[in-house]
Every structure is written in structure tokens, then in C-alpha cells.
Amino acid sequence: MENVRLTQYSHGAGCGCKISPQVLDTILRTQLAPFSDPNLLVGNESKDDAAVYDLGNGTAAISTTDFFMPIVDDPFDFGRIAATNAISDIYAMGGKPIMAIAILGWPVNVLAPEIAQQVIEGGRSVCREAGISLAGGHSIDAPEPIFGLAVTGIVDTDRVKRNNRAENGCKLYLTKPLGIGVLTTAEKQSKLADEHKGLARDWMCKLNIPGQDFANVEGVKAMTDVTGFGLMGHLSEICEGSQLKARVDFDSVPYLPGVFDYIAQGCVPGGTTRNFDSYGQKLGAMTEQQKALLCDPQTSGGLLIAVTPDAETEQQLQAIAARHNIELQAIGEMMPLDGDTLIEIC
């Protein structure tokens, strides 16, 4: 099979392909009266990670989909990353994935079908790691390669974790370092140092399985995954939904090695600017360096968790983190809303 650089066949990369929050708000406006279904526990009114439907037996179904264009050149790794990212929404709701189907767009007259087969194989390998079947899918002839999954999961109705239930005083935790967009941009610009090659890929392929365990902790009040809108975008959604503001300690935010050197070299993806243009007016003062990291679009990013500050909850949280080899420290806290600023950086 010929060597190809998949990223050269797409105009965007990973979750950086997302339509900006500002534009998306316009697209989703409707003149129609909302369809009322009492069993729909979570719809799109709160900008949550997935839809949740009450099955009436103490269990709810979770439904989500996610797909994008290549963020890496290797077809197998592209499939792995896209699948990991799609399954993450189930974990972010506190659920367990049970099945996935594939979504494939492929330029069949430009890229060989054997390359697409490797993309699917990468997705299949991650589904197996998550303990689910890749049970089917749909494909179209498309001008650019696109891959992702539609995923179904289940969760106890009293364990659903939403992004709009944070409480005043909650501590904020992030399970993966930031900088995915910066490092992948550095790689695309051939500026990535040898010691950093594969680092972003490995983090993007890390399943957010701990979300299932965090769902069992009563003190975990809100949870979401950090993807294309960056940490500030997804934290803004928590703040807006919970009618609170957040204070973030920048020095406590985890980040990938070398990220600030690459930012200084101009390795900032276009999605960072689009993100800031969409929600920058909600943020407090920050430096250009802080903006480049905190608004950096993540692909298959970590879980952002709002947790009550009591000792018992902290102990439970750290025990789960230890089981999953995660280092957790608080990066900020939720506070009463007292003006137009949703997030302060200190």
C-alpha cells in the first residue's frame, strides 16, 4: 500500500474542523415549537455531550455521533483517534458504551480503498478496547476523507452526568493535558521535535474510561469532555448552564511538553482564533500565550469535572485516578456569577 499523508487531503484536522460555537448557534435556530418527549432526559438545549433517553427501567440510553477529517497522516491512527473521540461522549455522560456504527466519507478516485480499510481497522481496534462491536455503518464518496462513529451507551438514570449541574465551590479537574492542536499543527508544519513525535497521538488514543467510575461519585456534579471548542469553550458551557462563573489557575492547568515553544514558533491552529472570536467576550484578561493554550482545539481531549470540595469526594476521586494511572490536581473552582465575565484566569 502506498504511503500517503492523509492530512494533505483535508482542509481541517480533527476537532479543529468543528463549526465555531457562534456560527453553530445560528445554524441550530428554529422557528418550530420544540417536540416534547418526557423520556428525553438530555437533548440539545444544554449543549451537552450526548442525548439521553429514559428506558423506563432505571436505565437510560445514550446516543452520540462524532466524525472529522484526518489529524494525523497514518490511516490506522486516524481511525483509532476518531473512534476514541466519538466514544468519549458516552463516558462524559457517565455511561458505558455498548455498540458503535461507522461513518465514512472517502474520495474513492483519489485515495485507494485499502487506505480506507486501514482507517476502519483502526476504529475497530479501539471499539474492541472499549469492549464494544463496530456493528455496521454508512459510507459515501466524498471530496475529503472523513471518519467517525455513532455510538450507543447505557447509564443508570440517577448516574447521568451533565454539563450544567456544577455548584458554587466545586473544584475543577482535567484528566488530559492541553496542547493537542498546537503539537499537531507543529507536526503539519514539520517543526515537531523528534522527542515529541507520537505524543499527541498517544493521548488522543487514550479512552476516557474513568468517566464510568466518576459517575458513581456523588460529589461529581458536572462532567464534559474537552474537544474542539477548547478548555475555555467547554468550561463556558458549564458556567452558562450552571449559572456560575469559574476561576482557573493557569499554572495548574496540565499541558503537553514543548507546547509553549511551539506556540512561540507560530504553531497555533486556526481553530484557536475561531474559538476566541466566539466566546472571548465571556473571558477575563489573559495573555496571548494563555489564549493559545486555553482556546486550543483538542481532539479526543480529557474529561473536565466539577467536584464538591469535601475530603471524602477528593479521596474517592483520587482513588479512581490512581486506578487509571491519571494524575489529578485542581485547576480552578466554580464561583457565584457577579457580572458578564464567565471565566477568570489567575
From Swiss-Prot:
Gene3D superfamilies, A to Z: PurM-like C-terminal domain, PurM-like, N-terminal domain
Gene Ontology MF annotations: ATP binding; magnesium ion binding; selenide, water dikinase activity
GO biological process: selenocysteine biosynthetic process
Reactions listed under catalytic activity: hydrogenselenide + ATP + H2O = selenophosphate + AMP + phosphate + 2 H(+)
Annotated residues for binding of Mg(2+): 49, 89, 225
Keyword Magnesium: yes
Cofactor(s) this protein cannot do without: Mg(2+)
Pfam families in alphabetical order: AIRS (PF00586), AIRS_C (PF02769)
Binding site for ATP: 18, 46-48, 66, 89, 137-139
Cofactor: binding comment: Binds 1 Mg(2+) ion per monomer.
Residues the record marks as active site: 15
Subunit structure: Homodimer.
Cited NCBIfam families: PRK00943.1, selD
The family this protein is said to belong to: Belongs to the selenophosphate synthase 1 family. Class I subfamily.
Protein name, per record: Selenide, water dikinase
Native source species: Photobacterium profundum (strain SS9)
Species lineage: Bacteria, Pseudomonadati, Pseudomonadota, Gammaproteobacteria, Vibrionales
Gene: selD
